[in-house]
Swiss-Prot record:
Pfam families: GerE. Residues 161-178 have a biased composition (Polar residues). GO terms for molecular function: DNA binding. Residues 171-236 form the HTH luxR-type domain. One of its GO terms (biological process) is regulation of DNA-templated transcription. This is Probable HTH-type transcriptional regulator GfsR. Residues 195-214 bind DNA. Residues 154-179 are annotated as: Disordered. InterPro entries: Sig_transdc_resp-reg_C-effctor (IPR016032), Tscrpt_reg_LuxR_C (IPR000792). The keyword Transcription regulation applies. The macrolide antibiotics FD-891 and FD-892 induce morphological changes of human promyelocytic leukemia (HL-60) cells and have cytocidal activity against tumor cell lines in vitro. FD-891 produced by Streptomyces sp. MAFF 225003 and MAFF 225006 inhibits growth of rice and alfalfa seedlings and may cause russet scab in potatoes. Pathway: Antibiotic biosynthesis. The gene is gfsR.
Length: 243
């Protein structure tokens, strides 16, 4: 197996996750890899197109290397009609992490040795909780200073040595910089909702939500949804998403 064991990091909501009497139904998207042994305890089946997703599915799991592009295709073609979806990667690829998060994934895990850990993570994801592999969450904490690069190896953003325009330091919680409305939008964004879905739930125009996000990105010193999510979720002061 690749990567360290995935333990639920600080991105999991403290709200207890209800126990399910029936096993999770997992729609598995994987083109070349064999089924991961970790999902054998669930009702899982292979799917190749978004139209194959069933209303009874609890989670869509994209398994294998560089599945971000396929995840984006599913998300776009389903037009918001997917259950919570996540990636189980065979190796850590920062470009793929950001592509998956930008496309609405609420989980990005690495292959693990203990099936019980993945089972717990998938149950949390099925209830809308965001789960990141510890390596991803820790990297976000270390490089989460305003204006700094969230993933230096992929050069998503160049470090800003001049500091933030707001005068905040890397030790400040990202939530402190945001208004209550902006925090609510980030909470919903972290749960995997699209701009359209956030607008509907908050009874706002889509343009208004996009304007809010533009201001949020500026305050957090980031340039994209994935960077904002890593900053928001990876920082110890970040807030978790729950429905």
């Amino acid at each position: 197996m690749h990567g360290a064991a995935v333990t639920p990091p600080s991105t999991v909501s403290p709200t207890p996750v209800p126990t399910q009497s029936a096993p999770l139904s997992v729609a598995l998207v994987s083109h070349r890899c064999p089924d991961p042994c970790e999902v054998t305890g669930f009702h899982s089946r292979r799917v190749h197109e978004p139209c194959e997703i069933r209303p009874s599915d609890d989670v869509v799991l994209f398994y294998g290397p560089r599945m971000g592009q396929e995840l984006r295709r599913f998300s776009t073609e389903a037009n918001g009609g997917l259950p919570p979806f996540a990636v189980l990667a065979t190796c850590l690829d920062w470009d793929d992490v950001c592509l998956a998060l930008d496309s609405g994934a609420i989980g990005y895990l690495l292959e693990i040795e203990d099936p019980d850990l993945l089972a717990a993570a998938l149950h949390c994801i099925s209830h809308g909780h965001t789960i990141l592999a510890p390596q991803i969450a820790e990297h976000a904490r270390v490089t989460s200073c305003p204006g700094g690069a969230l993933r230096q190896t992929a050069a998503v953003a160049r470090p800003d040595t001049s500091g933030s325009a707001t005068g905040r330091t890397g030790d400040s919680s990202p939530s402190l910089a945001l208004s209550p409305q902006e925090r609510e939008i980030m909470t919903r964004l972290a749960s995997g909702l699209s701009v359209r879905e956030i607008a509907v739930e908050m009874r706002l125009a889509e343009k208004t939500v996009r304007n809010y996000l533009s201001h949020i990105y500026g305050k957090l010193g980031v340039r994209s949804r994935s960077q904002a999510l890593l900053r928001w979720l990876g920082h110890p002061g970040g807030e978790t998403a729950h429905h």
